[in-house]
Design a protein with these regions (language model features):
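Basic, helix-initiating cap at the start of DNA-binding domains
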Residues: 1-32, 36-45, 62
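Amphipathic alpha-helical segments used for helix-helix packing
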Residues: 67-68, 98-120
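Hydrophobic alpha-helical segments that form the core
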Residues: 148-168, 180-186
Length: 196
């Protein structure tokens, strides 16, 4: 066996172990909330030692963040051939569903309790997605679907904050009707009319 084959086998084993651990986090969160989540239980469910988990993640909050990222890896892709309104509606609906799942709810707890974790989530997860949304906004301006003279950063903050607000304070997942109305009202001041 060549060194390259050995390396590939080790890489594959590492990837499989990580997947088992992340699956174990999902399983555990289906039974207990974040405060009762333990590395011992996750290790037992995944069939690995605690040291294996700590080799890749320092804290259980890191595990929850990684699990959320894995669960939503392909969920938030934008469709650049479709309208800004369509894309924002789809993103907010998918975010609502993702945050209402066990890993999403645990992540909300982590962010409320840990400023550093919240900052990491913002930098590593939200900023790249926001950058994609900025590109879509620019494309929508170029297509003359929306006006350019608007504070889009604040608009995005308001849209996403409304979803978090519904989930955290009202313990409800915004439905399609709510999201459609939210996006329509938010975009109304900047939509280009055919007569413009």
């Amino acid at each position: 066996m060549t060194a390259a084959n050995i390396f590939m086998n080790e890489t594959e084993k590492t990837s499989k172990r990580k997947q088992c651990i992340l699956r174990a986090v999902n399983e555990a969160l289906a039974e207990v909330d974040y405060s009762k989540l333990s590395i011992e239980d996750i290790a037992s469910r995944a069939g690995v030692g605690k040291s294996t988990i700590y080799r890749w993640w320092k804290h259980k909050s890191d595990l929850v963040f990684e699990t959320f990222k894995e669960n939503t890896a392909s969920v938030f892709e934008l469709e650049f051939d479709k309208s800004l309104q369509y894309n924002l509606s789809q993103q907010l609906l998918k975010l609502s569903m993702a945050l209402n799942q066990q890993a999403g709810r645990a992540l909300l707890v982590v962010m409320a309790e840990n400023r550093e974790a919240a900052g990491d989530f913002f930098k590593q997860y939200l900023l790249p997605r926001r950058e994609q949304t900025r590109k879509l906004i620019q494309l929508s301006i170029e297509r003359q679907e929306i006006r350019a003279d608007y504070d889009f950063e604040t608009m995005l903050d308001m849209l996403y904050a409304a979803v978090h607000y519904q989930i955290i304070f009202f313990n409800c997942v915004p439905d399609e009707a709510y999201v459609e109305k939210l996006v329509t009202v938010s975009l109304a001041p900047i939509m280009m009319n055919k007569a413009d």
